[in-house]
Amino acid sequence: MDKAAIFHRPESEMGYLTKQNKYCVRLRTRHGDFARIRVIYGAPCAEALRNIEGNTWAFDQLEMTKYLVNGEFDYWEALLPVSSKHRIKYAFRLLDATDGEYLYGENALKIFNLQNVARMRGFITPYLNKYGQKISNDWAQKTVWYRVMPDRFANGDETSDPEGADDWNNDPMKDSLFGGDLQGIIDHLDHLQRLGFNGLYLTPVFSAYSGHKFDTIDFFQVDKNFGTKETLKKLVEAAHNRGMHVMMDICCDHLSDFSLEWQDVRHYSERSSYAKWFLIDKYPVRYVPSDIPDYAKMLTYEAVDDNPHQPRLNFENAEVQDMFSNVFRYWTRNFGIDAWCLNNADELPDSFKQRLKDELRVLDPSVMLVSKGRFKANDGSENVLDAVFSNSYSCEIVDAFTKGDVTPIDLSDSQVQTASKRRSSAIPCDILEFDAPDTIRLIDACGGNEELLRSLLAFSFMQIQAPCFLYGTEDLLSVKAEEKDENSGEQPLLNAIQSPSLQPTMKWEKEKQNVTMTRFVSHLTAIRRKYSEILTKGSFEWGQCSNKTGFITFTRRLGKQQLFCCFNLGYGSIRIVTPKNAKLLLSQNLMEKDSRLGKQGFVIVEM
């Protein structure tokens, strides 16, 4: 028995109040150490009822289920009824394969007996009421996201084009502006609807200098090259009329150096009204430029990744928090924004995020706040907002399919680790994103291999989290990684970070569209939406996984309904046998007569 592997953290993803007014408790143990585990629980005040005859704390017992398993750990779960007192004391009764019994409470692991139960310091919940429940965004669990960079998607209003706009078919440069706009998105909403997407995810639309708009100048204005506030409102209404929800990107940790606030600081130094809005080490604010425009040395102020054009904001300042509170409430109240993606949310104070969530819930109880972090794992670090981008798991999936650095067994372990760090009700709202404005394209990560891309996408659509497409994936839109010196001996990284300005424009000519891929995406989204209940609420059970031959199997199960999935990541074909009564939903490189699944093949069947 590995005592160090036994772990429980109360008031976290391992102990929380559910929407069904139950208290979910979880326990982690070393794989195979215990045959059964029970939760012993009761009211904390029951201890006071002991009498001189030696009666101990009155408790009930509930069997735990093993809800996650990998090669390293077993994860156990039970749902405790919340008593009329709204407080629970609990501990764990562990039974090993040799009938040994142990008691795990707050202070230690001991032999299970009534004497130790009487002396035990158990885990005690705070007062449990509905305020402690995480609101589940039911609409988000059924959403398939499509991410759009307005400047690169479609030009629907040439009157708003920037001066000197690039030709739409030119290769992008770091300072490119192509003239895509909000009207262009409106014009092509039917395209997204035909593909089956019901979530529109917009990169920033606020006033900014660049084409990608992550360098915001004014959070209260729509960028003039994208259109007007009226156009944005028209876009949101048009999306809603098609059953789509709209999520907006926002970067709260910095402003552009073109912003009025920063220009005021540059001019007046410490006498500026905004001096305390930023993290300034020394006045006047200055830096030493380098050969790279977005990197500087010897800055006298804090900037994102030493980019002198993105001075960091001071979120300890109440005025900064008030400004952003007004920003979120303004766009949510007046434009009907359904969700917000907070970039670099792991660098924002939890107190501000809680305030933001409370304020927006008053305007719209179903609004969703999503954390996209930079430095934390993203799979368990966010305790305040509604959902996260499961970036670490996304990277594991891409590496497993495209590089082979992650083995099938490693991938299954990663999925279990990701699920263990999140509340069950939160995972279906979390987002799996494989390429983004600051990465190369997924088709490029796949080396241009369409079959590999389709296999990876099919795998992602069978996960619990909501899948997210970057515009143009359905047409194999490609952008090459920045080339390195041929004599350096280094290869470009498949997941290399690069400027969002290098993302290509969408190709709308019919001859440039990929009919096969478009049809495949439509099938995927149809399956995801038809089987949303089993995919978001059902269990995820790993089957056989082989590092030697490179195949993965798993089952998604909800009641009597089952989806069986098999993916071949190896170099040769594998033998596969599906039940006669199974309904084939989607496959690739399946040789039914020979009962074999070819290289980069997959099969998804309903049992």
Name what the model sees in each region.
Residues 31, 593-607:
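C-terminal beta-strand-rich structural cap/linker in extracellular carbohydrate-active enzymes
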Residues 236-242, 254, 333, 343-425, ...:
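Active-site-proximal helices and loops of the catalytic beta/alpha 8
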Residues 144-146, 200-202, 246-248, 340, ...:
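Hydrophobic faces of well-ordered beta-strands that scaffold small-molecule active sites
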